[in-house]
Amino acid sequence: MKRSKQATLSRFFKKPKTGADAVHTEAVIGKKPTDSGSPAEQKDAKSPQQVTDEPPLEPVTVTTDVVAMDTQPDLSIGSEINSKSRPKSLASFKSGKSINTDHNPELKQKFRAKLELVRNKNDEDLPVITKKTKLNATEFQWYEIKKQHRDTLLFVQVGYKYHIYGDDAEIAHAQTRLFLSPGITNLKDIGNDGVVQQGSKYIKLAYSSFPVHRIDFYTKQLVEKGFKVGHVQQMEVAALKNVENKKGPMIRELTNTFTKGTYIESGNGGSVNDVQYSSYLVALHESKGDKPTVTLLATEVSTGDVIWDSFNDDYVKSELEIRLLTLAPCEILNCGVSSSTLKMCQKYMHRNKGRLAEMNVLEEEVEDPDAQVALFFEGKANAGTCSTVLELPAMVKTLILATSRYLTHCKLDSLFLLTNNFTRYTGSYMRLSANTVASLELFANTTDHTAKGSLFWVLNRCLTVFGSRELKKWVSRPLTDRTAILQRLSAVEAIIKSIYGAESDELTTLINKLVKLLKPIPDLSKMLMRLHYGQLNRKEVYLLLRELLFVAQEFKPGSGDKYIDTNPVLGEIFNSLGIHVSDIEKLLEEINPDAARQDEALTFFVTDPPSLVDRKKDLKKVEAELQIELLALRAELNRPKLQYSSVAGIDYLIEVANKDTKKLPLEWTKISGTKSVSRFRTPTLNSLVKRHEYCVEKLKAACDIEFNMFRSRCATHYEFFRSMVVAMSQFDCLFALAKVSGQSGWVKADYVDEGGIDLKDSRHVITEKLMTNYISNDIKIRCPTVVTGPNMGGKSSLVRQIALSVLLAHIGCYVPASKAQIPITDSILCRMGAQDNIMSGQSTFMVELCECAEILRNATSKSLVLLDEIGRGTTTTDGIAIAHSVLKHFIELEALTLFITHYPLGQLLDSEDSNKCDLVHMDITNTNPPIFTYKMKPGSATDSYGLNVAGLAGIPQAIINRAEEMGKDMKHDVMYQEGVRMLTDIKKVM
């Protein structure tokens, strides 16, 4: 048997008084007073402004040891219970004392535990339900939607809160610590008609809730943890429903679903360090056959970038791996890939806490993608761009169609209308292998895979979030065209002069002006895309236009013309910033700045459109009638200065001292009260308030329609606004490179076609930021070079240092050295580090050879190749044979190669190759113990000093001594074999 609210409360408080006060108290605890509204309104009303179909929670009941209270608190809507009469914790029910748990976590935890114990005890004490129990209207709506979207966590709007039901509530509780009310979590416990099945432990759904304004907070938390979240919105307004006398529950619909790759956080700020977490959604398809073709489509909904590619891949999917490492997707759509590719994606997503989803490709999307693309663009505002998409490969078009269906649930499919944002992954950029990106630590260190300790971490001195995002692209795509590199360097030099130079000229003035404008600027790139999607609110639209105007006003049209010849990169940037001033000014002239800053709907426009004028007239008419009613009440109560009061968001209340309430007419409805006063409404006032709320909601709806139209007009300028934002992001990247390049000990490189790498006082760009007293090196690489030296002597660090210097020079940055000569390089191909691939069933040696095979296929005479101990994963004879053959290939190719090895050089190099290959080693002192100097010297190393490393690692001395004796014998054998080989070679010559 269900306890009534009044019965439960009566266990705590004295019985209501009789007489006139009884009428007012009945309105308080939920009974139907005379002329107080329709039954539907009284049943579930939480306030006069809000009508929901959700019943109130049953209050927690406490057993008979509760001390009776001396006073009777007012329990009405909006009442202010005196702190002396309100128990602060469960313990205070027994002690009568007020206990504050806010600053005592331990006490707070005990209170929650005891509260949960009482709640569970009450559930057990409930008598067995013999009649059928049905879900309420809101719960049944959730149930019907949940059956169709079982993979989605649903947030259901109920008045001014969002409710989470069933197993969704359990997940939300576990992930976000929202309070959980126990109940049904399994859909099988509910019949299709919403009736709770026999044998269920509970008669109601488990649920959690939170206020409406926290929707973004909890959505972001769950989405970032890999969940799919859906918003079920109320499609009706309570005030309109009341006045129009509509029956039945609120209409609710699933309006949006969000995943890690489709969620765009509202707000305009953010840290420049946040860009290490990419938000690319990548769709993949793989054809069948011996040489499968992989098609990739990457979309970043927050910036509008669309990147596509189609390529043939090898056994270990090295081509796909480099794209995943560079793009760093947070979500992958499997549109049909092989089991080996799927395993690779699973491993990548698991390591990066991403989301892997299945997306079936429709038959018509494969058989006739052109027709489906034309259908997608039909009737759209910029349908003329359809031709751009039709020129793409067939499977790319198929993936666009599949991804657009996936984005439709998030209302983001209009992304593909912006075809100017389409680019191919492969272009006129330096090729970087997957191992290169990982081993050189371009975006994440190899220890904990965070940004700190990466090249991007060193270079990211950007002022804006969107600038940092663009810089990440620059690092992943070094330039290979000499002219483009020199033009970028020219811009960097000019900015260095403005930052560190004493002299000032017109160009320096423009640079400093733009730097000041960018420092406080929000994430305009993300705001611009949200404008395109129709997601910006009034305040955000105003801020976007205002920030664009601030920049545009400082740069007149043609302000960069004079620099086009001398500094074309900066000249084009300045020209892109000042050409749309009039368009922005016209849009801002329509906006009331004060109202926009407050996100105020009713006064947003300076001049109201005709539709708003009529609605405001209706509202003023009702407000005039409310003033007339106030005059009548003043006369009736003989209170000439009487004014309406507002409490807790409830307006138009008549405040009366409690001592005078007995004189009031019985038909007056009590709304709220305190110890000293009570607040009422008359029947006439109730009617006027409902009309007022109706007019306000109608006006708000009209304001929303007008604002949506205005926002759409702003969105038509998307391409113009985007050109400004792109120019700002490019300047921000140049500024970041200038901040780094302007440091002491950095130098502009000389670019050559031949002559090799020549670095004086070269340093490791990352390591010198993490430690002091870094030892520099003079480096000359003219041909394939074999690097030897002791373990822990710095061989791997040195070759990474060289590669990073080459990469820095190709993105338009200075190099950490006192002098630098660097050849134009088309690729940096790296095979370093020992790792296996258990998910793909590949051993360390297999991974090593597959990556080596990729390098052999792609290397050219203009490549920089880094190979670290090739052949070490197998027997010595096989390893030497493989290393010998690989090194010989690069000697014949004449590619700049750094070949690290511990193998005997006599077995590694043929006599005819000795003059075509240089030998260097990392020096070490001959002291005991030896000291690493970390200096590169010509020639080969005499020993690897592996036993010294064994001692440092803690290997017992007895074992080291035994190994030392064994090593001497083996060394004698090797020297004997080397002598025999030399005599044989001499004999051949003679």
UniProtKB/Swiss-Prot annotation:
GO CC annotations, alphabetized: nucleus
- GO BP term, pick one: mismatch repair
Q: Which Pfam families match?
A: MutS_I, MutS_III, MutS_IV, MutS_V
Q: What is its main location?
A: nucleus
Cited SUPFAM superfamilies: DNA repair protein MutS, domain I, DNA repair protein MutS, domain II, DNA repair protein MutS, domain III, P-loop containing nucleoside triphosphate hydrolases
Enumerate the subcellular locations listed in this protein's record, separating them with semicolons.
Answer: Nucleus
Q: Where is this region: Mispair-binding domain?
A: 129-261
Q: Which residues bind ATP?
A: G789, P790, N791, M792, G793, G794, K795, S796
A GO molecular function assigned to this protein is:
double-stranded DNA binding
Known partners and oligomeric status? Heterodimer consisting of MSH2-MSH3 (MutS beta). Forms a ternary complex with MutL alpha (MLH1-PMS1).
Family recorded in the similarity comment:
Belongs to the DNA mismatch repair MutS family. MSH3 subfamily.
Q: What does this protein do?
A: Component of the post-replicative DNA mismatch repair system (MMR). Heterodimerizes with MSH2 to form MutS beta, which binds to DNA mismatches thereby initiating DNA repair. MSH3 provides substrate-binding and substrate specificity to the complex. When bound, the MutS beta heterodimer bends the DNA helix and shields approximately 20 base pairs. Acts mainly to repair insertion-deletion loops (IDLs) from 2 to 13 nucleotides in size, but can also repair base-base and single insertion-deletion mismatches that occur during replication.
What name is this protein filed under?
DNA mismatch repair protein MSH3
Tell me which species this is from: Yarrowia lipolytica (strain CLIB 122 / E 150) (Yeast)
Lineage, broadest ranks: Eukaryota, Fungi, Dikarya, Ascomycota, Saccharomycotina
Annotated gene: MSH3
